[in-house]
Amino acid sequence: MKTLTFKLYSNNNLEIDEKVNYFIKDEVMNFKIDKDTYKYDLKTHNLVKTNHEYTIDINFNKKLVLIALNGYTFEMNIINHSIKNESNNIVIEYTYESEEITNNKIIINY
């Protein structure tokens, strides 16, 4: 099985640094980190994270971060973003405003 490295920086703090197995089906990269399932669409670059408690949908086309929790959906606007996809290396940087401005950077090497 193929492996990828997934890193998430939030406000320059490394929050996730994992090497996990993945597969691609219908141009969607599927992988799990702990109990969380991730789906990254290689065409639209949208990222969805789900577990038994909540879903986070980062939709760059709509410039929204959607969080679904206990039957409620919360929306946070993406202020700006950039996506670089070069030879099995994806770097996504985005900023959104919740209680404060949050800068995230996701790096996927596969």
What are these language model-derived features?
Residues 35, 53, 71, 98-100:
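Residue-level detection of beta-strand-connecting loop/turn positions
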Residues 5-9, 30-34, 48-50, 92-97:
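Short beta-strand segments that buttress and anchor functional surface loops
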Residues 1-2, 42-44, 59-63, 86-91:
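A short, compositionally biased
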Residues 89, 95-110:
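Mixed-charge, glycine-accented linear interaction segment located at domain edges/termini
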